[in-house]
């Protein structure tokens, strides 16, 4: 874990591996308590961690059932009380007990620390009980720890109660930290005082090399307040305390002191504390990083004893390594002055200066861990990211960096390479990437055009960049080149610093070296080349010039596209504004801050500003997690590219921020097909980078800006087409010609990285239908830092739940082909083409499809050949041009690719022919069904013959687009699929016709008899219960289930009737009056990311009103009057009256259901526990419920209903609906509690005792 620096290497250097810790939801408090307590007592008994036998290092073992148990040797030691007595002899030899549990308990009682369980004090029998009672032994260990803490902290004043002991130790830590803060502030003031007459410094005076220590006044460390044990979780207070007593072992420069502290910062500090305790405390640190980070309540005593042991070491024993600093005597800690508070609290979240003190990836991407006195480069960020894909980040980081370096680039603040390394005692985390100002230096001179904002003022993006660039030259020696970087060693000029690459790069101008892909820190080979400056002099920044990065970043005339810098945290704000912009509007959502804060700004305003910055810091940490996740998905994009292999145009891409592979803008491949992907590397073995002028940089940015503008125009044109298609249906416009949306990918090459799956895969799932997505947000002023994120991928990524979009549920089937005439073409390095009528192929390189895309394929068929974005024909029946997926594999020869194209085109032609034949067959079916409808209508007495004919024509007409949508799906699986579809379609169409006809006939016929009794329709054969498990095994599920999980699947069967197959097809009986649940077919509510509640979607088919009818890319819900008889049958058999014991009652109720002519049945529950009481029928006219079986009120009015429920036949359970209105989607209900009599009737059939 820790490596010592070689002898003579200067300051102390440590190398940590970033730990992998358990998250809080996986952290077991009880297990952590047992592990920490056993580890402590073992170390205390054996006299230190190094003396514990190896077999007892880990007190737990895991059995074959993955259950943890205490090892038998540890159990034997605990049962014999030998372990406790040995621990007592080691810590308190003057009070040695006899080795027996009774003597130990008596001794602890005399010391005032009686171990107790929740029920009673620990007895001797509890300690001897077998199997071992771990709770009793942990109580004894806690009592031992308390007794030892009392003994070790006798010199601390106050009563000897546990809470008082805790408070005394915390007060000791807080007092030490406050005294260290005073000392640090005094030293900072002393260092800053010689720098006061900066403006009057004469250049003629003899000068020396400027050292980094002069910039210490820019920011100060933020020392934490310690009032509770939770304040120790950051590790800052403990590490600062160790530094106070052992400054030579732990330097203050190594401690991360900032506010707020991230988890990464806390882990870094806690590693320092763990390392010190393991090396210098007698019993080490038996607590894990999770224990110190989470500070759970069960480990309170363990933390107190650790503090007590530290106090004993520092204040009582005082070994040789304890050399306490000469701190001011301040037991009464002076409060922080108001001038320091904002800078300390804000320094961690608002300064644009990054400090490489923490071994974690930055929010924008991997950054280089530059540390160490020699300026050695420990690792390459690209290689570190590859290694980080394992179990932990294996980056090695050296510290302290006593020679801090400041370097910057012309990129935005969210770029991978915008790195500035600051003061030694400043913030140590890369999570402090805000746009706030640094702490202003009262006497430093700045450029007149760049005034320093006052404390607390949040500058704009451009001002923040100017602050960065204007602050850099103060660190340069007098007479050095503009872009030279220097690391000043504390040893002075006696040792020339090492250079990571040949020294001729040290004299290159700033614009020549900052605009290259790998950014390095160079060191002068000969310090005498630069003339020294006078003591305390800080050089003024040079004026903006063509070679200055400040001119590139802040000058509006840097290029003709007027680059605007925006932080990564501001991108989400642009999404809101982008919808209101059109054409080539540029989103400029920079933080709005006043020009200058008035001197009368209240303290309340300062506190609110601190809170806001803390919230922003939390938001940045979340964004860092997402950025790391995206980088992990784009593993193949981070390839190490040698700059010597790239020349000419490849260097222009380096100027644009070295966009990682897979995140290049979509338009980049058009104008510059020869650009290669490169990532920022800090490899020490690379050669010098050839110079390049500022003009090339501007030209490259202009080209990319023009490409992005062209893309945005295309996107705007497509958006306009979508808006026209969304016009009211009564006046639809003519269908536009098929417009091709070309998204060119990056040019491939030997070093080219594949596009990230996180960027390219969602684009393939875009539904062709128009959506309510905002106007495409491709900025006109495309700054280089923003080029990392392809704007088109954000526009193309759809929500997974199509059914939740309102516009996808309001269009008739005849509109669907017209609204989806726009095709999507994803090509590799292809310029935009004019719309053509020939079939368009979607070519996606296989390398760009990672595991997430591969997981979506449901079978082993050729990838994507069946998943087409195609609709067969418009409502008029004319075929449209074919469209499908074709995955381009760069490794396969062209002839094989041509064969695949030919096969795909052949399949598409077959689908068109099949659609044509199906339409002809459908016309014949229409005539046959009209005749059948007329014949059935004549059988009903006293009815007009024209009504059923007209009514029956409507459902037949709605089946036409459904048939066209089915054609592509049938060809995907061959003859078996086609035969199955045709057979089940015939069955389904006839059943639907009869159901809808019956819906028309029943209300009229019911007028001649009782409710629901008149006009009885022809009896159909009784069908069995709908078995969802059998449906899941059917070909419809196996062949369509995975297809429907894709948003763009348009060639599937109708969801509302897919389960009505003929009995001889699947061997499963199907209901004839109502379609079962189509939830097995992955309806949109079952898609990943769906947030709809059960009563808001139709996935469970608990009622006729919730069954959707699938008509291509749009899902809408069509209410019908089908019966829920079989849903109730399913509910009674599997939920309400399941099992043998309820079988007689269930059979009686099912017989009543079969006798009844009602359409809608409802179950009465006793209460919300869903206990079956009775079965009711719903009258559609009076909305009253009539009891059919069971016991309960004979009639139930809507006012008596308390709650209504809907049955989910897939999950076999009822779900309460947050409504009170009875409708066809209700399957069960409860009545108000006062309507139930206290005494239940003896049998369900008796109704005399039931409430009326």
From Swiss-Prot:
Pfam families: CAMSAP_CC1, CAMSAP_CH, CAMSAP_CKK
Ranges of biased composition (kind: Polar residues): 335-353, 374-383, 441-450, 525-534, 812-825
GO cellular component, one term: ciliary basal body
Gene Ontology BP terms: cilium movement; embryo development ending in birth or egg hatching; epithelial cell-cell adhesion; establishment of epithelial cell apical/basal polarity; establishment or maintenance of microtubule cytoskeleton polarity; in utero embryonic development; microtubule anchoring; microtubule cytoskeleton organization
Region (Disordered): 183-205, 331-385, 429-457, 479-604, 638-697, 712-935, 962-981, 996-1030, 1063-1114
Coiled-coil ranges (or none): 595-629, 696-727, 896-943
Keyword Cytoplasm found: yes
The protein's assembly and partners: Interacts with PLEKHA7. Interacts with CAMSAP2. Interacts with KATNA1 and KATNB1; leading to regulate the length of CAMSAP3-decorated microtubule stretches. Interacts with AKAP9; regulating Golgi assembly in epithelial cells. Interacts with MACF1. Interacts with isoform C of CDH23; leading to inhibit CAMSAP3 ability to induce microtubule bundle formation. Interacts with AKNA.
Family: Belongs to the CAMSAP1 family.
Role played: Key microtubule-organizing protein that specifically binds the minus-end of non-centrosomal microtubules and regulates their dynamics and organization. Specifically recognizes growing microtubule minus-ends and autonomously decorates and stabilizes microtubule lattice formed by microtubule minus-end polymerization. Acts on free microtubule minus-ends that are not capped by microtubule-nucleating proteins or other factors and protects microtubule minus-ends from depolymerization. In addition, it also reduces the velocity of microtubule polymerization.
Protein name: Calmodulin-regulated spectrin-associated protein 3
Naturally occurring in which organism (per UniProt): Mus musculus
Upper taxonomic lineage: Eukaryota, Metazoa, Chordata, Craniata, Vertebrata
């Amino acid at each position: 874990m820790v490596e010592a620096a070689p002898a003579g290497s200067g300051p102390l250097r440590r190398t940590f591996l970033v730990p992998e810790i358990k998250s809080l939801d996986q952290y077991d408090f009880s297990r952590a308590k047992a592990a920490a307590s056993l580890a402590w007592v073992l170390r205390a008994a054996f006299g230190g961690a190094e003396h514990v036998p190896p077999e007892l290092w880990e007190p737990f073992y895991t059995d074959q059932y993955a259950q943890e148990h205490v090892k038998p040797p540890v159990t034997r030691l605990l049962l014999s009380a030998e372990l406790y007595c040995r621990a007592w002899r080691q810590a308190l030899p003057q009070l040695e007990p006899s080795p027996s549990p009774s003597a130990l308990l008596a001794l602890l009682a005399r010391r005032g620390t009686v171990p107790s369980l929740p029920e009673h004090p620990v007895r001797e029998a509890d300690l001897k009980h077998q199997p071992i009672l771990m709770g009793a032994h942990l109580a004894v260990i806690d009592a031992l720890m308390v007794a030892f803490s009392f003994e070790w902290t006798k010199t601390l004043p106050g009563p000897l109660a546990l809470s008082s002991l805790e408070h005394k130790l915390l007060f000791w830590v807080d007092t030490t930290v406050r005294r260290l803060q005073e000392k640090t502030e005094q030293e900072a003031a002393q260092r800053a005082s010689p720098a006061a007459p900066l403006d009057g410094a004469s250049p003629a005076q003899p000068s020396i090399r400027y050292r980094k220590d002069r910039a210490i006044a820019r920011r100060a460390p933020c020392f934490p307040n310690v009032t509770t044990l939770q304040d120790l979780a950051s590790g800052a207070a403990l590490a600062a305390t160790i530094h106070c007593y052992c400054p030579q072992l732990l330097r203050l420069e190594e401690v991360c002191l900032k506010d707020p502290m991230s988890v990464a910062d806390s882990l870094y500090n806690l590693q320092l504390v763990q390392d010190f305790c393991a090396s210098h405390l007698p019993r080490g640190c038996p607590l894990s990083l999770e224990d110190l980070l989470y500070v759970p309540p069960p480990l309170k005593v363990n933390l107190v004893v650790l503090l007590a042991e530290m106090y004993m070491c520092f204040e009582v024993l005082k070994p040789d390594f304890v050399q306490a600093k000469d701190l001011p005597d301040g037991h009464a800690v002076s409060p922080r002055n108001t001038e320091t508070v904002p800078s300390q609290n804000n320094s961690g979240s608002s300064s644009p200066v990054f400090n490489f003190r923490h071994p974690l990836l930055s929010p924008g991407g991997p950054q280089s861990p530059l540390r160490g006195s020699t300026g050695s480069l420990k690792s390459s960020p690209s290689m570190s990211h590859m290694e980080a894909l394992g179990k932990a980040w294996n980056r090695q980081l050296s510290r302290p960096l006593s020679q801090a370096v400041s370097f910057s680039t012309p990129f935005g603040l969210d770029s991978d390479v915008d790195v500035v390394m600051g003061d030694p005692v400043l913030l140590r985390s890369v999570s402090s990437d805000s746009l706030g100002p640094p702490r202003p230096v009262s006497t430093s001179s700045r450029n007149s055009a760049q005034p320093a904002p006052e404390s607390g003022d949040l500058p704009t993006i451009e001002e923040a960049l100017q602050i960065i660039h204007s602050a850099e030259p103060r660190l340069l020696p007098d007479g050095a080149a503009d872009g030279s970087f220097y690391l000043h060693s504390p040893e002075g000029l006696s040792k020339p610093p090492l250079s990571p690459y040949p020294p001729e790069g040290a004299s290159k101008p700033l614009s020549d070296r900052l605009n290259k892909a790998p950014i390095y820190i160079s060191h002068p080979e000969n310090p005498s080349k630069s003339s020294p400056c006078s003591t305390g002099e800080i050089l003024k920044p040079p004026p903006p010039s063509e070679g200055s990065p400040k001119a590139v970043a802040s000058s509006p005339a840097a290029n003709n596209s007027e680059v605007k810098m925006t932080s990564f945290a501001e991108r989400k704000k642009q999404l809101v504004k982008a919808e209101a912009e059109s054409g080539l509007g540029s989103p400029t959502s920079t933080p709005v801050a006043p020009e200058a804060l008035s001197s009368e700004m209240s303290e309340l305003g300062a506190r609110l500003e601190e809170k806001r910055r803390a919230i922003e810091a939390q938001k940045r940490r979340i964004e860092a997690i997402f950025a790391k996740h995206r980088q992990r998905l784009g593993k193949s994009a981070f390839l190490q590219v040698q700059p010597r292999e790239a020349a000419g145009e490849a260097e222009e891409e380096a100027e644009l921020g070295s966009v990682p592979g897979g995140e290049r803008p979509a338009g980049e491949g058009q104008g510059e097909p020869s650009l290669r992907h490169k990532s920022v590397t800090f490899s020490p073995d690379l050669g010098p980078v050839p110079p390049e002028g500022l003009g090339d940089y501007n030209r490259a940015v202009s080209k990319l800006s023009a490409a992005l503008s062209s893309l945005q125009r295309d996107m705007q044109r497509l958006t306009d087409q979508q808006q026209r298609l969304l016009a009211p249906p009564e006046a639809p416009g003519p269908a536009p010609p098929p417009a091709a949306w070309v998204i060119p990918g990056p040019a491939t090459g030997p070093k080219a990285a594949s596009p990230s799956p996180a960027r390219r895969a969602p684009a393939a799932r875009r539904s062709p239908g128009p959506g309510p997505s905002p106007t495409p947000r491709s900025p006109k002023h495309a700054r280089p830092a923003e080029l990392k994120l392809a704007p088109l991928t954000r526009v193309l990524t759809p929500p997974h739940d199509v059914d939740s979009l309102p516009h996808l549920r309001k269009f008739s089937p005849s509109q669907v082909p017209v609204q989806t005439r726009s095709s999507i073409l994803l090509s590799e390095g292809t310029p935009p083409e004019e719309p053509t009528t020939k079939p368009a192929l979607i070519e996606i390189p296989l390398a760009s499809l990672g595991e997430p895309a591969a997981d979506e394929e449901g079978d082993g068929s050729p990838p994507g050949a069946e998943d087409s974005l195609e609709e067969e024909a418009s409502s008029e029946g004319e075929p449209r041009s074919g469209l499908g997926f074709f995955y381009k594999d760069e490794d396969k020869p062209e002839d094989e690719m041509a064969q695949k194209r030919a096969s795909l085109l052949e399949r598409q032609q077959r689908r068109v022919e099949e659609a044509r034949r199906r339409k002809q067959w459908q016309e014949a079916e229409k005539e046959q069904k009209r005749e059948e409808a007329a014949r059935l209508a004549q059988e009903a007495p006293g009815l007009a013959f024209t009504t059923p004919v007209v009514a029956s024509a409507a459902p037949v007409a709605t089946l036409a687009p459904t048939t066209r949508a089915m054609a592509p799906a049938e060809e995907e699986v061959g003859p078996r699929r086609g035969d199955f579809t045709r057979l089940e379609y015939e069955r389904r169409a006839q059943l639907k016709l009869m159901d809808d006809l019956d819906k028309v006939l029943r209300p009229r016929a019911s007028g001649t008899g009782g409710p629901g009794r008149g006009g009885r329709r022809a009896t159909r054969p009784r069908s069995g219960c709908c078995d969802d498990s059998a449906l899941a095994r059917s070909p419809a599920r196996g062949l369509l289930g995975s297809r429907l999980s894709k948003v763009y699947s348009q060639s599937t069967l109708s969801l509302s009737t897919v389960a009505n197959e003929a009995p001889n097809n699947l061997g499963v009986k199907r209901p004839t009056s109502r379609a079962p649940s189509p939830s097995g077919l992955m309806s949109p509510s079952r898609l990943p990311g769906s947030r709809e509640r059960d009563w808001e979607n139709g996935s469970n088919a608990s009622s006729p009103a919730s069954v959707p009818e699938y008509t291509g890319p749009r899902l809408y819900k069509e209410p019908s009057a089908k019966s829920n008889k079989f849903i109730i049958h399913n509910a009674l058999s599997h939920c309400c009256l399941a099992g043998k014991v309820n079988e007689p009652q269930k059979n009686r109720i099912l017989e009543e259901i079969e006798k009844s002519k009602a359409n809608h049945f409802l179950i009465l529950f006793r209460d919300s526990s869903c206990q079956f009481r009775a079965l009711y029928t719903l009258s559609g006219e009076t909305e009253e419920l009539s009891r059919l079986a069971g016991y309960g009120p004979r009639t139930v009015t809507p006012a008596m209903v308390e709650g209504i429920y809907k049955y989910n036949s897939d999950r076999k359970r009822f779900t309460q609906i947050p409504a009170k209105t009875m409708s066809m989607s209700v399957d069960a209900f409860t009545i108000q509690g006062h309507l139930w009599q206290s005494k239940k009737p003896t049998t369900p059939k008796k109704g005399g005792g039931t409430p009326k």
